Amino acid sequence: MDAKVVAKISDLRKTSDVIIDSHALTREEYGMRAIPFSAHRLSALQLDALLVLRCDPEVLLDRIAADRGGRREMSVELAREIQLLQESLCLSYAVLCGCHFYAIDTTTKTKAEVKSTALTILSKIGMNIIK
């Protein structure tokens, strides 16, 4: 994340809440790759919370099969590992930032239920959420 992005987010936060959608972990031909944000840049974002969406690995594979979107095949174990690494990275960010961390289990939830859960969480930590 470069300084321009941090500056833009800081500017936007003056007038509204900001949600950042990040996929910090990627699957590469050789394995996994994460290019973590520096502690300085994370601190500059002044994050209030980190939310991770997760589900049972079998459900993740079913969702990928329904909408491949260029994603490669993977095993149940790899799907589980990717999610655990992503959750771990986000938890590390939360610890560095001193902010809340939530992992929302989407296994049995509809998109509307996931949205409602996320908005409820953000509301409870004091964000001005318009539903």
Go through each PLM region and give its residues:
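Short glycine/proline- and charge-enriched loop/turn segments
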Residues: 67-74
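A short acidic, glycine-rich active-site loop
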Residues: 1, 74-84
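ATP-dependent NMP and nucleoside kinases share a basic, alpha-helical "lid"
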Residues: 23-67
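Hydrophobic beta-strand segments of well-ordered beta-sheets in folded domains
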Residues: 18, 48-51, 100-101
